[in-house]
Structure formats: structure tokens, C-alpha cells
Amino acid sequence: MAQVVHIKEQKYDRQLRLWGDHGQEALESAHVCLINATATGTEILKNLVLPGIGLFTIVDGNVVAGEDVGNNFFLQKESIGKNRAQTSMELLQELNDDVTGNFVPESPEQLLDKDPSFFCKFTMVISTQLPESTLLRLAETLWDSNIPLLVCRAYGFVGYMRIIVKEHTVIESHPDNALEDLRLDQPFPELREHLQSYDLDHMERKDHSHTPWIIVVAKYLDKWRSENGGQMPKSYKEKESFRDLIRQGILKNENGVPEDEENFEEAIKNVNTALNITKVSSSVEEILNDDRCTNLTHQSTSFWILARAVKEFMAMEGKGNLPLRGTIPDMIADSDKFIKLQNIYREKAKKDASAVESCVSKLLQSVGRPPESISERDIRLFCRNCAFLRVVRCRSLEEEYGLDTAKKDDIVSLMENPDNEIVLYLMLRAVDRFQKQLGRYPGIYNYQIESDIGKLKSCLNGLLQEYGLSLTVKDEYIQEFCRYGAAEPHTIASFLGGAAAQEAIKIITKQFVIFNNTFIYNAMLQTSATFQL
């Protein structure tokens, strides 16, 4: 067993550094459904199979045609005439022995007619190149069950993605440049006691130059506050004065020249970090005050039960503060001093997590859930990351398309720049209308391009008029979309495959933050944009 674990660690080494063992476990226990084994679809699955998605099912009733072989590297000449789902599944499964693949040789329309609940058994569903009418039916089915749907589409030199999920909660958002949780502005009792054991004025030189910078800042902060009415250095001028105060504490040699004490230089450098005020961010406050946090039920997810437990901790043991994160950065110090300081933060974090665990136990009992339904590991993970919680709520596709609920004002505002990527969204909606009316996409055959330009323009104007949008789209966009002929270039499919797989992994692992809710890629100009539509 240990050997198997070691082999997996070697195989997935790089990704384990990104999302950890628990993230990999979530990935390996996931079951993803792909609708349509197009070039885009197989590229997405490739990027999920390689990192070890547990199980995938391809739904596709089409047989492999010559055009599929032309733009899909996972299909061969010998595949022509065979079911596209089965052929793609067999070839994709060869990429990773740890992954299990299934296929359903039926169209999504057939499954939606026969058994809509079929799609509700998956961790998430990814659709590619679906017509609008089918997409709306699928989205409605999954919305009610809160099953995430990732819509992907490559259309000529345009890439499109839409995430549709009622609510997606993120514990490990991995923010860039996150501030340390040191609590030097309000030291907890264990830290205060440890600080009192240091006397920087009566130390041997070796000890003085190997004292952790956190201790150095804390000791001089006490001195500053005693001389400034208990206030923290706030303005730039005050912080510079505080740095000078620390600088004066550097030992001097017999000639009065300051010694080279790197720990003090480190303290001066980290003043802004150390003086960070302990407070709860507005985004986390919003989560803790959310109705789902306040009004728990038997259906409440573990995220909301944990959030409520943290809120109760803050009202009692936390005295208004979140549980301590329990980590400190690396620094210049001797091992003994650093480890003692590190352990003080760790033990305080464990103590806070234990208090939260008690709250969780009571809350689980109150909503009729078994105590083991939220593990100790989950509680500690939540406490360690509770300063960076995120909740993403997407609008439904029905709301986006509804005449009364569409974000018309936002679209008009964006179209003040006639070349904004939102114009590509409008064109995709127009070609869908074209397909609905004529049963094909514009420009499929070269001889139709010229005549289809006028028809597509009419569809676009009809769409704009229906939504009451007084907008003008440049003719060159209409002409370009007719020239695309609904082609799915592999270069665009490949780009989307990487981007979509990344979002899928975020959804499955509940790590990092997904976009909300629409992504447009303009390959002509190598630009992209996200919109909340």
C-alpha cells in the first residue's frame, strides 16, 4: 500500500504541490460527464485524465466523420463510421491507467427526453458545441440539482465558456500576496507570555542577532505603544519613525559602528506586514452574515455549517477574531527560537480549531446530521483558510436569456467600445438564432457565405430588437462569423481545453476561484474577457 502511495506521489508530484493530497482525493473521486466528443471536448478530457480524474462518461450519439478526423487528434481514419463517444473514450483512457472511462452512444436530446435525471448523478457536466435549445433544457435540469455545468464552445477564432452553478463555495482560494496572520496588534496570551521571556537590552550578541524578527518587531511595538497612548503606527511618517526605533536597537561594536544584524534588517523590512491590523475582511463578513449561514437546516452543506461554527467561535473564544491561521514565514533565527515561536502559533491554531470543532458538533446535532459527517481534518482546513473564503453564485442561463432578466444595461455600456469582446458574445447568440431558424449555421459551404451575411445580419438585428438594445455591430464581425462556417479549429479547441479543464479542477477540488460567469477568447487579437451576464 505504501509503495502505491509513493508511486502516486511521484506521478502527480507537481499537481500535489498545487492542490495537495485532499485536492487529489477530490479529483480521483469525481465523475465528470462530457457531452459531445468534439475536438474541444476531447482536449478538455485529456487535461482531466492526465491529472487523474476518477471517472468520466462521454455522451455522444454521433458517428465519426471525416471532418472529425481532420480537426481532432484523438480520432484516426480507422475511426470513421464508429461511434464517436466509444472511440474517444478508448483512446483517452490510454493516457492514464488510473482513470476509468464510460460512454453512452446516445444524443443528449434523447437522454433529456427519456431520463433527465441521468445528468444529475455526475460531479459536474461539461458540454461542447450544443445547440441553444438543448443547452437551455440541460441547464435547467442541472440548475435545480445544483450540479455545475461548464459550457464550452469553439467557433472559428472565438472561444466561449460559461459556468452555470447556483452556488459554488471555496475554502482554499489561494489568494495572491496574502498577509500573514501574526496578531502583533493584539497578541494572544500564549504569545504575550513568550514575548515577555525576551529582553533585547540584556542579550548576548549571538542571541540578539538570532532572535526572530517577529519578536523584534513585537518588543519595539510595545515600546512604541507605551510612548504613543497605546496607538499603532499608522501613517507613513509614523511607520518610518517606528523603523528608526528598531534601527536604533541594532548592536554597535566598540567603534560605535552598527553590527551586521540581518534579523533586525528583516524586522525593518517587514514592518508593514507586522503592523497589519487584525480584522475580518468585508467579503468574509458577508459570508458569515449570509442567510445560509444564519439559518441552518438538514440540507445545509458542510461549508455553511463550518462558517456558522466559526461565527459562533468569534462571538465567544475568538473575541471578534477568526481562528488563528497558525503559520509564520521563514526568517533568520536559530532553530530553537524559531521552533518555539512556530509551536506557539501552531498550538494556538489547534486550540482555536478545537473550539470550532465543539461548535460544529453542536450544530450537526441541531440539524440532525451525524457527528462524523464533518471530519476533524475538514475543520482544521476550514479554520486555516477562513480568512479567504469565497462564495460564487452564477446566474442561470434562463435568467441570462430572459427578456426581462438579461443584463441589457451592462451590454449597452460595454458596447460603447464597438470592439469590446462582448460583441463576440452577441454574434454567438446571433448564429444560434440563425441555426434555430434555418437548421444550419451560416457559411457552412463557401457558396453560401455571401447570401448568409444578410441573413445573419437580420438574425442579429432581430435579437437586438427583441431585447430592446439600440446597438450597431460592425459589418466586419458579421462577415467574419459567416466565413467561420461554424468551424472548430484545433488551435482554439486546444486553448479552450486547457482553460476549461482548469476551471473544472477548481470546481471539483473547491480550490482557487472560478470566473463568474462568462469567458470570451478572441484569438484574432489574442485577448480575453469575463462578464457577469
From Swiss-Prot:
Give the record's pathway: Protein modification; protein neddylation
Q: Which UniProt keywords apply?
A: Ubl conjugation pathway
* InterPro entries registered for this protein in UniProt: APP-BP1, ThiF/MoeB/HesA, ThiF_NAD_FAD-bd, Ubiquitin-activating_enz
Membrane is among the record's keywords: no
Query: In this chain's numbering, which residues are marked as the site (Interaction with uba3)?
Result: H210
Region of interest called Interaction with uba3, as start-end residue ranges on this chain: 330-343
Q: Which is one Pfam family of this protein?
A: ThiF
Report the function annotation for this chain.
Regulatory subunit of the dimeric uba3-nae1 E1 enzyme. E1 activates nedd8 by first adenylating its C-terminal glycine residue with ATP, thereafter linking this residue to the side chain of the catalytic cysteine, yielding a nedd8-uba3 thioester and free AMP. E1 finally transfers nedd8 to the catalytic cysteine of ube2m. The covalent attachment of nedd8 to target proteins is known as 'neddylation' and the process is involved in the regulation of cell growth, viability and development.
| Protein family membership | Belongs to the ubiquitin-activating E1 family. ULA1 subfamily.
Question: What is the protein name given in its UniProt record?
Answer: NEDD8-activating enzyme E1 regulatory subunit
Gene designation: nae1
